[in-house]
Amino acid sequence: MQMKVILSIMVLFSLVFLLPSDAYANDGSIILETTSLEHDARQGQYNSLVQVDSDTYALAYEGKDKDGFISTFTISSDGSSIVEVDTLEHDDDHGQYNSLVHVVSDTYALAYAGTNDDGFISTFTIDSEGVITPIQIQNHANTDTVDDVANLEHDIVQGQYNSLVQINSNTIALAYAGTNDDGFISTFTI
């Protein structure tokens, strides 16, 4: 009987001191998944996620048929709710190795590997509601609309493993693997 009491006290002691507490949750020692959303049931690779405003997020990824997509989501401040808002297929051929960055105001730039793994940069506006409007994208090269402008093909050999950062309000820098997987850093004015 005495052994059961000791074991019960030890179990209670371990539960009290080992259960996660909000007081310690922000020190990085505990990671708990709050919720999740399967936003693409066919394919969702080469993800790059950025915050648009307090509860709006934009995701560039390779989706179905290896095409390039951007989707926006509203995520509650406590992470308990994720709702998809808008999706745009910006490249109907290829969209790997995405790196999405905020440039200025509601303008965003995306570096990715497109057709033949060439390096491309596209631009979009994303408003605070999550509505995506293309400015310069690869699919514009396939239209007859006068206002549609194709995106920039910055490397005609290879543009993989992109990492894009904002330098100032109209300049971005891109690190990527180019010809023969050599490392390159390039800057661009948007």
Residue positions per predicted region:
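Sec-dependent, cleavable N-terminal signal peptides
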Residues: 1-25
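Extracellular, repeat-based ectodomains that mediate carbohydrate processing or recognition
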Residues: 26-190
